[in-house]
A protein has these predicted regions:
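Bacterial N-terminal signal peptides that target proteins for export
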Residues: 1-8
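Acidic, contiguous segments within the catalytic cores of piggyBac-derived transposases
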Residues: 11
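N-terminal signal peptide c-region/cleavage motif recognized by signal peptidases
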Residues: 17-20
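Acidic/polar surface patches and capping/hinge elements
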Residues: 23-415
Length: 415
């Protein structure tokens, strides 16, 4: 996972980050994303607090800016603030305080970035008023979305027959996932998909055969483009699209802050439901199923004891597809924000390929579909699992869009 290089890159970015006034929301959200990626790549497992860091940052920025330019309902029930306060100061302070809370080891770099951001705000009274608003928003956000102490945190237990060997590496899914408080969804179970298809069904045989043919390392049926897609989509970065949207004429800081907050809340709620379902169903990956195709009770599946996937198999259960879940959630949120065919296209980078260029898609749904397809080309998921994940993502996003950060009625004469 290129842990060392990601951590060095994040440290360098911290040292250089000085959010510009016009891009305060994007700059701090991009910084939050880099810190989150470095924490995820670290050999030390993320804490429950850290998996909420990026969303808390987005929520704190939104609440701070929305307190000054009151356009939407407050998620954290914060009162309206001084309308003359600096929105840049409020956003920078909110982000800084949240990131410092979650990544104390980065204090010196964060302090430098924050000092540079605040130094660019000339109006001292507006700056200090914004600082106070940002501090209040961060304090509230840091308490939101955490672990519910009333819910158990059950460690994963490998399932096998007594006396039979099983791989000793535990899945990289921490016990706290099921105990986190969702942002909007009532509980992860509200989005739980139906069980995987029956192993004796025609659907199982069809999807088994698809991944066997297209997802193997030595596949002769997968095209060179499909191979590139599998590698490129292992880790994606939507920030080029977010920046393009945020920079559009007429966009306001509070609109941009809300966009990031809704995006992150939908991402989190979809991801949590997906992880809980994975642990519940414990379904086998293609590398296991295809090598044991004679053990599934289906005469239409033929075993291949030498089959290996194109991509490394993630160290946790298969169903439902995680990439498919979050990509569908993102596409649903962004379609609601700017339409399915945004001006300038859907611009995505890859975090899996060093120095990758930005790729443009015409539509959000086309990008999300390619993410889903890429997991089959990579040999790590089945089509029915992709579809289950897509459904989770869309439902989670729709719930967040319908229930959180709703526009307030505008008073007559207001702009």
């Amino acid at each position: 996972m290129r842990k060392s290089s990601r951590m060095l890159a994040a440290a360098a970015a911290l040292a250089l980050a000085a959010p510009a006034s016009a891009d305060t929301v994007c700059e701090w959200m991009e910084l939050a994303g880099r810190l989150g990626a470095a924490a995820q790549a670290s050999p030390t497992p993320q804490t429950a607090d850290q998996v909420r860091a990026t969303t808390r940052t987005a929520l704190a920025i939104f609440e701070a800016v929305n307190s000054i330019d009151r356009r939407y309902q407050s998620y954290l029930n914060l009162p309206a603030g001084d309308s003359a306060a600096s929105q840049d100061a409020a956003a920078a302070t909110a982000a800084y305080q949240v990131l410092l809370h979650h990544y104390p080891a980065q204090r010196s770099q964060l302090e430098e970035s924050y000092a540079l951001a605040m130094a660019g705000i000339a109006d001292a009274r507006a700056r200090e008023a914004g600082r106070a608003i940002g501090e209040a928003a961060a304090a509230a956000a840091n308490q939101a979305g955490g672990v519910d102490p009333a819910l158990p945190q059950t460690p994963y237990r490998p399932r096998t027959r007594p006396g039979e060997w099983i791989g000793a590496s535990l899945p990289s899914l921490e016990p706290y996932w099921g105990a986190l408080r969702p942002w909007v969804v009532q509980s992860p179970d509200a989005l739980r998909p139906p069980p995987p298809v029956a192993l004796t069904s025609q659907r199982w045989a069809r999807d088994y055969e698809e991944v066997r043919r297209l997802g193997g390392r030595t596949s002769t049926e997968r095209t060179p483009h499909q191979t590139l897609v599998a590698r490129y989509r292992q880790a994606f970065d939507t920030m080029p699209s977010m920046r393009l949207i945020a920079d559009a004429p007429g966009r306001t800081p509070v609109q941009n802050a809300r966009m990031f907050a809704v995006y992150q809340m939908a991402f989190d709620d979809a991801a949590q439901a997906m992880v809980v379902a994975k642990l519940q169903y414990n379904f086998w990956r293609p590398i296991t199923a295809i090598r044991n195709g004679d053990a599934d009770g289906n005469d239409a599946t033929q075993p291949d004891p030498n089959w290996v996937p194109l991509l490394p198999t993630p160290n946790f259960s298969e169903y439902p597809c995680g990439h498919c879940t979050v990509a569908a959630a993102i596409a649903e949120v962004m379609t609601a924000e700017v339409g399915n065919r945004p001006r300038g296209g859907v611009r995505i980078m890859s975090l899996a390929i060093p120095n990758s260029v930005v790729q443009a898609f015409p539509r959000w749904d086309a990008w999300a579909q390619e993410v889903s397809d890429s997991r089959i080309y990579g040999g790590v998921h089945y089509r029915f699992s992709n579809e289950a994940g897509e459904q989770i993502g869309r439902r989670a996003a729709r719930m967040v869009l319908d229930r959180a950060l709703q526009p307030l009625p505008r008073r007559r004469g207001s702009r």
